[in-house]
């Protein structure tokens, strides 16, 4: 049975998990009392995997009542350095503890030549880059043994070395690895405005069967370009959501 089919089965299995929110400390008390209309939660791996105290207690308590998915920012999927062993061990501990139906990270890097950037750094969508990311995604899937999603990211400069569009890069990555996609519609919009492409064409290019989760967030307008800050209200997402079907978690 192909890995592509496993992502389709994942969508079917969790089709009732329609609407989720990011789990944040200011909401702990209210969520412990009740979470009407919320089907699942998302935790940031780096804010959760080595933290004890109340944060750990609340995450563990909610994990008994709701699915909790894990979203990372520091896996450095596209990086030239080997994966950080301590990071992988800590991530593995979190995943084993809360048993997420899937986990995810960005199509970026955050570590290179021994330097930690603590940011999501874009890279050229080249054939060599595709080979490197393919190898690393396959390693992550094998090590953790559960569905893994890759998120499209925002970027603010075009790379002359790029040989593929971002959408085509993601399509080929899905075909090569059987990974799922976490579609960030705000990142699509920000990139489309900044780089002058059609966001609907981008979304239509992606394999809808691979889109398991959708992120919706806001951005800031500098006057000359948009910046993905998650610091403003999300723009209307519903038309984009309909384009990739109704079986995705948002």
Residue ranges and their predicted role:
Residues 1-93:
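N-terminal pre-domain/capping segments
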Residues 24-26, 44-46, 73-76, 107-108, ...:
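Active-site beta-loop-alpha junctions enriched in small/polar residues
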Residues 28-33, 159-175, 191-204:
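Distinct, well-ordered alpha-helical segments
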Residues 41, 103, 148, 184, ...:
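Conserved, mostly hydrophobic/aromatic
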Residues 59-65, 192-219:
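A short alpha/beta connector and helix-capping loop motif
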Residues 109-115, 158, 190-193, 215-230:
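Flexible glycine/acidic-rich beta-alpha junction loops that bind and position SAM and/or redox cofactors
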């Amino acid at each position: 049975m192909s890995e592509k089919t496993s992502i389709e089965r994942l969508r079917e299995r969790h089709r009732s998990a329609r609407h989720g929110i990011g789990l944040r400390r200011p909401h702990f008390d209210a969520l412990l009392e009740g979470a009407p209309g919320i089907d699942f939660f998302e935790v940031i791996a780096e804010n959760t995997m080595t933290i004890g105290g109340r944060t750990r207690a609340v995450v563990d308590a909610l994990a008994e009542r709701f699915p909790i998915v894990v979203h990372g920012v520091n896996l450095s999927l596209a990086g030239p350095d080997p994966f950080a062993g301590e990071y992988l061990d800590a991530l593995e501990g979190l995943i084993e503890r809360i048993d997420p139906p899937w986990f995810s990270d960005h199509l970026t890097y955050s570590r290179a030549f021994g330097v930690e950037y603590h940011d999501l750094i874009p890279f050229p969508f080249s054939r060599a880059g595709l080979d490197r990311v393919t190898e690393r995604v396959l390693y992550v899937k094998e090590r953790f043994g559960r569905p893994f999603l890759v998120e499209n990211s925002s970027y603010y400069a075009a790379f002359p070395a790029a040989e593929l569009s971002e959408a085509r890069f993601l399509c080929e990555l899905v075909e090569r690895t059987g990974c799922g996609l976490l579609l960030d519609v705000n990142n699509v919009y920000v990139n489309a405005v900044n780089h002058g492409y059609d966001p609907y064409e981008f979304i239509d290019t992606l394999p809808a069967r691979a889109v398991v989760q959708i992120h919706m967030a806001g951005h800031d307008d500098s006057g000359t370009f948009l910046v993905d800050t998650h610091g403003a209200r999300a723009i209307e997402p519903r038309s984009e959501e309909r384009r990739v079907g109704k079986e995705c978690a948002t």
